[in-house]
Amino acid sequence: MKIENKSDKEEDQMFITFEGIDASGKTSLLAKLKAHVVQKNLQGKCTFTWEPGGRKSPEIQTIRHLILNKESNLSPIAEAFLYSSARRIHLDKVILPNLAKNKVVFCDRFVDSSFAYQAFGRDLGFEKIKLLNELATDKKYPDITFILKISYEESMERRKARQEDEDRLEKEENSFYQKVIKGYDFLASYPEFQKRIFVIDASKNQEEIFESVLKILKDHKTFQTHPIYKDFFS
């Protein structure tokens, strides 16, 4: 498949996403990155958002409730369409406007979650979910994606330690999450995505994970060209 070249305007944009199974450490990592941004006084040049949710858009919150509510009885394909619909709204309302302002957008989950959870976890197939999401997003992909990799057993231990009420997806069984993990492994080796995806050993402590991400960002050729780069690492 031919990969379209970015326009000059898109070359100046930086869209960074974070992926992984539940309790992989994305929330803690993003909190550290946000603190780093505040320390560098770059709040006005960065945006932090998430899926499904995105700055509490009422439309997306309605979809989120449908997807995650334990009382919902959704078919796998209905679930996939709901995620892609929420993603389109999120793009329109949060991601694209902030990228147009040349802000760095840090996002907790994006299309790769649909690939891992719906294409693999729900057995809908990669090509089908890729087609659906490319239609929904106009083939918008992140510039950099970090996949935080942990085992299902480690995920379960962390989730039990949190002692939080689990949503519909978090209640899925081992077999579902093993397929999701295989999905993330597939994405990391998929030729079209290899340049943007970096796998992080999320079994390490939070500081080690944070430092690993900072090093990748510091060495990343595209990030080096962004106006924020010098101040981000000053």
Swiss-Prot record:
Q: What Enzyme Commission number(s) appear in the record?
A: 2.7.4.9
Alphabetically, the GO molecular function entries are: ATP binding; dTMP kinase activity
Catalyzed reactions: dTMP + ATP = dTDP + ADP
Enzyme class of the recorded protein, top EC level: transferase
Q: Which GO terms describe its cellular component?
A: cytosol
Where does this protein hold ATP?
20-27
What GO biological process terms are annotated to this protein in UniProt? dTDP biosynthetic process; dTTP biosynthetic process; dUDP biosynthetic process
Give the InterPro entries listed for this entry.
Answer: P-loop_NTPase (IPR027417), Thymidylate_kin-like_dom (IPR039430), Thymidylate_kinase (IPR018094)
Keyword annotations: ATP-binding, Kinase, Nucleotide biosynthesis, Nucleotide-binding, Transferase
Q: Which Pfam families match?
A: Thymidylate_kin (PF02223)
CDD domains listed in its UniProt record: TMPK
Family per similarity comment: Belongs to the thymidylate kinase family.
Q: What does this protein do?
A: Phosphorylation of dTMP to form dTDP in both de novo and salvage pathways of dTTP synthesis.
Which PANTHER family does the annotation name? THYMIDYLATE KINASE, UMP-CMP KINASE 2, MITOCHONDRIAL
Q: How is this protein named in the record?
A: Thymidylate kinase
Organism the protein comes from: Mycoplasmopsis pulmonis (strain UAB CTIP) (Mycoplasma pulmonis)
Q: Which lineage?
A: Bacteria, Bacillati, Mycoplasmatota, Mycoplasmoidales, Metamycoplasmataceae
